[in-house]
Amino acid sequence: MKTTRLWIRDPLAILAQDSGGGLVIDGTRIVERVAAGASPAAPVDGTFDASRHVVLPGLINTHHHFFQTLTRAHPVAINKPLFAWLQALYPVWEKLTPEAFRLATRVAYVELLLSGCTTAGDHHYLYPKGLEHAIDIQVEEARSLGIRAFITRG
């Protein structure tokens, strides 16, 4: 399958050394850093004028609890301090189904991707009956969305 080589040309600012001329992307991978005033070493299929754009690296979220995306505004826990909040939500979380957990995981990954995060770490500590394979669900969702992930069991 042929991929498209795109030159992100002459960005206003870029946080990659020796890349003032931009980056060449082949499919989903950065394949070349282009020095200021230079052109890519190999032909490209398209060019994006980035002269009014800032090119940032993918962000990394190192601490998340994906399952909590479903209860972030749950009425039983709004405006409570941490331990009261946890006590209010544990009974809700213990009823979490694999389907709801998959949805929570997908929502978390998509929100992170939309905000520029390309790597996410989840500290998963919730294993009610029926969610013994929660980490498998998280890995499947990460693969389906193309986000890098590291999952820890708490």
What are the language-model segments listed below?
Residues 65, 125-126, 152-154:
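Active-site beta-loop-alpha junctions enriched in small/polar residues
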Residues 52, 149-153:
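A structural signal for short, well-ordered beta-strand segments
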Residues 17, 68-72, 129:
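Active-site-proximal flexible loops/turns
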Residues 1-42, 53-55:
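N-terminal metal-binding scaffold of metallo-dependent hydrolase/deaminase domains
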Residues 73-123, 128-147:
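Alpha-helical scaffold segments that flank or form the walls of functional sites
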